[in-house]
């Protein structure tokens, strides 16, 4: 038995634009139905299947609630795999990456928690801009190469945002 499509699991049509509140509600509903504790008195095979269904549901939810993971998944459904560690080939974006990394390093050296918060806010705006761009481009099947380029950028910003969170935690301690 193969893994069902993440969107089908939630009775959604594959699309980038999702109602995240509706997704979360449906996830909670499905999680209650497939939770392994409900199968504690069942046979070993049923328990194993419940664990598998629960794991599949969790993976699907994590994928769909993240814009970059959702975009990457949509492309994969169409046969356009974007590796997780895909590099961005766009010179302008590479320069932007260098600028962000230098700024993050300065914030770290200065232990500037307020500066980190402002930096994080700018990253969030950049992420939202990429999400909006992907949503527009996704509607045009002829622009899948552009969509792949945006996913690479989205993945970079996700990684950088994680680094910012780690810096915040270190500075907060």
UniProtKB/Swiss-Prot annotation:
Superkingdom, natural source: Bacteria
Pfam families in the cross-refs: DnaJ (PF00226), HSCB_C (PF07743)
Chain ranges of the J domain: 5-77
One Gene Ontology cellular component annotation held by this UniProt entry: iron-sulfur cluster transfer complex
Keyword Chaperone tagged: yes
Gene3D superfamilies: DnaJ domain, HscB, C-terminal domain
Intrachain S-S bonds: none
GO molecular function: ATPase activator activity; protein-folding chaperone binding
Keywords for this protein: Chaperone
Signal peptide: none
GO process annotations (BP): [2Fe-2S] cluster assembly; protein complex oligomerization; protein folding
Keyword ATP-binding: no
Family that this chain belongs to: Belongs to the HscB family.
Function: Co-chaperone involved in the maturation of iron-sulfur cluster-containing proteins. Seems to help targeting proteins to be folded toward HscA.
PANTHER family named among the record's database cross-references: IRON-SULFUR CLUSTER CO-CHAPERONE PROTEIN HSCB
Matches recorded under HAMAP family: HscB
Quaternary assembly: Interacts with HscA and stimulates its ATPase activity.
Matching NCBIfam families: hscB, PRK00294.1
The name this protein goes by in its record: Co-chaperone protein HscB homolog
Gene: hscB
């Amino acid at each position: 038995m193969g893994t069902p499509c993440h969107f089908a699991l939630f009775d959604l049509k594959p699309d980038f634009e999702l109602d995240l509140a509706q997704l979360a509600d449906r996830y909670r509903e499905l999680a209650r139905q497939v939770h392994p504790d409900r199968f504690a008195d069942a046979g070993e095979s049923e328990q194993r299947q419940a664990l598998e269904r629960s794991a599949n549901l969790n993976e699907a939810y994590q994928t769909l609630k993240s814009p970059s993971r959702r975009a990457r998944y949509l492309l994969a459904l169409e046969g356009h795999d974007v590796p997780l560690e895909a590099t961005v080939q766009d010179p302008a974006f590479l320069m932007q990456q260098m600028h962000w990394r230098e700024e993050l390093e300065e914030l770290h050296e200065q232990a500037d928690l307020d500066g980190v918060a402002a930096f994080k806010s700018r990253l969030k705006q950049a992420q939202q801009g990429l999400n909006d761009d992907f949503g527009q481009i996704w509607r045009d099947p002829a622009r899948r190469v552009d969509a792949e380029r945006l996913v690479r950028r989205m993945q970079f910003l996700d990684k950088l945002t994680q680094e910012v969170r780690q810096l915040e935690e270190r500075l907060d301690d």
